[in-house]
A protein has these predicted regions:
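Bacterial N-terminal signal peptides that target proteins for export
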Residues: 2-12
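N-terminal signal peptide c-region/cleavage motif recognized by signal peptidases
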Residues: 19-21
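Boundary at the C-terminal end of the N-terminal hydrophobic targeting segment
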Residues: 24-26
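Second-shell loop/turn segments in exported
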Residues: 29-33, 93-105, 147-156
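Zn2+-dependent metallopeptidase catalytic core
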Residues: 32-55
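Active-site scaffold of zinc-dependent metalloenzymes
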Residues: 69-104, 110, 114, 120
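Post-HEXXH active-site segment of zinc metalloproteases
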Residues: 120-159
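Long, well-structured alpha-helical subdomains associated
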Residues: 148-155, 164-237
Length: 237
């Protein structure tokens, strides 16, 4: 979700520990893995109650360069992939969780990934709304750089949608904590920011500084969609 955390597509799960249930105790997990899974559990329970096919996958090998949390999609199921072992960013992210709101922040992170899951399941990943016109690729780029540019923009749009879903969850489940968690997400997205890069989602986050901007739709996905579409137009200006 956060820095250096591109979404994992059709992740290779050989040797990984897959958890079909929501309990992490007694599964050979580290305390940090148990902590993250416990924090994400309300979102995972909501997903399963809603009929979304989700699993937790824990990578048992050291993964120093991986995103601590990412989403995989395999055999029609969404995989919440934890890569915390031998990964300094896992501990660093944990240390950056807002004091007193750690569980709610982990829920926000999980809801972000659930937004990706929803887009995969709908077959909408990297797809743009009808009528939306993206700006052309800058001139003078090689074919490889053109593909990289288009991929970067597509990832950023999906990350923006994921952030809006995450904030929609927060607005519905923890309204009294919304301002603090919104500020924390702004801070995370501003760390080492490269404007226009994969995780530059500030265009969308700024649109929902006031949670009322997310409307009153009962679904966090439906709440995110119109704001996401508005942000697409701003992002192209």
């Amino acid at each position: 979700m956060f820095k250096h955390s591109l979404v994992v597509l059709r992740v290779a799960l050989c040797g990984a520990l897959a958890l079909s249930g929501l309990t992490a105790k007694g599964a050979g997990l580290t305390p940090l893995e148990q902590r993250w899974i416990a924090g994400m559990t309300p979102v995972l329970q909501h997903a399963r109650t809603s009929g979304m096919p989700v699993d937790i996958v824990v990578q048992p090998q050291d993964a120093p360069d991986a995103a601590p949390l990412a989403l995989g999609f395999k055999d029609g199921r969404c995989k919440f992939v934890l890569s915390l072992r031998g990964n300094p960013e896992g501990e660093a992210t944990t240390q950056r969780l807002p004091a007193g709101l750690e569980d709610s922040a982990l829920e926000l992170m999980a809801a972000h990934e659930l937004g990706h899951c929803r887009r995969y399941l709908e077959g909408a990943w990297f797809h743009l709304p009808a009528g939306f016109s993206a700006t052309p690729v800058p001139e003078g780029l090689s074919p490889d750089l053109q593909r990289a540019y288009l991929s970067m923009k597509s990832v950023r749009r999906e990350e923006g949608y994921g952030d809006l879903v995450a904030l929609g969850w927060t607005a519905q489940r923890h309204p009294d904590q919304y301002a603090a968690l919104h500020a924390w997400l702004m801070q995370e997205r501003s760390r080492d920011l490269l404007p226009g890069s994969h995780h530059d989602t500030l265009t969308w986050i700024k649109l929902v500084r006031d949670p009322k901007a997310l409307g009153s739709a009962p679904s966090m996905f439906d709440a995110a969609l119109p704001v996401w579409q508005s942000g697409l137009n701003i992002d192209e200006e």
